[in-house]
Curated annotation (Swiss-Prot):
Gene Ontology biological process: translation
Region annotated Disordered, chain positions: 1-63
Physiological role: Binds to the 23S rRNA.
Gene from which the chain derives: rplO
Keywords of this entry: Ribonucleoprotein, Ribosomal protein, RNA-binding, rRNA-binding
Bias-annotated ranges (Gly residues): 21-31, 42-52
Subunit structure: Part of the 50S ribosomal subunit.
Family: Belongs to the universal ribosomal protein uL15 family.
Entry's Gene Ontology molecular function annotations: rRNA binding; structural constituent of ribosome
Keyword Ribosomal protein: yes
Annotated InterPro entries: Ribosomal_uL15, Ribosomal_uL15/eL18, Ribosomal_uL15/eL18_sf, Ribosomal_uL15_bac-type, Ribosomal_uL15_CS
HAMAP family for the chain: Ribosomal_uL15
Listed name of the protein: Large ribosomal subunit protein uL15
A GO-annotated cellular component: cytosolic large ribosomal subunit
Length: 155
């Protein structure tokens, strides 16, 4: 096989439609758009969900439920492995995590998760701590302090 003999598999590629090039092409004159009407015009067509002026389904059905999602507290996540960089005996606070750039917006809410290993005894202060993270920190001889609920939402 030579470089000039390379070709895609038959049927793998389609030739593009050249519209408006005579009736012999099958796509001449109206270019497959039919006659007149909104969909025949350039830029024509209706938005998704438009039902021709009839009240759309989404507005015919009643509203249901309630969502508090915009006000949900979104914690910055820190794993146990990220705490390994601190020296033994350090008190790890959200302010310290911000300063050392372990995570951004740590003061708005930090949750410590249990991925990785920890070999140093640290005192960890966070807004939330997973059970596996708590076990690993305490197994390394450290302490966990849960500080008050995060007041600001992390957006």
């Amino acid at each position: 096989m030579k470089l000039h003999e390379l070709a895609p598999n038959p049927g793998a590629r389609h030739e593009r439609k050249r519209v408006g090039r005579g009736i012999g092409s099958g796509l001449g004159k109206t270019s497959g758009r039919g006659h007149k009407g909104q969909k025949a015009r350039s830029g024509g067509g209706v938005r998704p969900g438009f039902e021709g002026g009839q009240m759309p389904l989404t507005r015919r059905l009643p509203k249901r439920g309630f969502s508090n999602a915009p006000f949900k507290v979104r914690y910055e996540v820190v794993n146990v492995a990220d705490l390994e960089r601190f020296e033994a005996g350090t008190v790890v606070t959200p302010e310290l995590l911000d300063e050392t750039r372990v995570c951004k917006n740590a003061t708005k809410g930090v949750k410590v998760l249990g991925t990785g290993e920890l070999t140093k005894a640290l005192t960890v202060r966070a807004h939330a701590v997973s059970e596996s993270a708590r076990q690993k920190i305490e197994a390394a001889g450290g302490k966990v302090e849960v500080i008050g609920e995060a007041t600001e939402e992390v957006k």
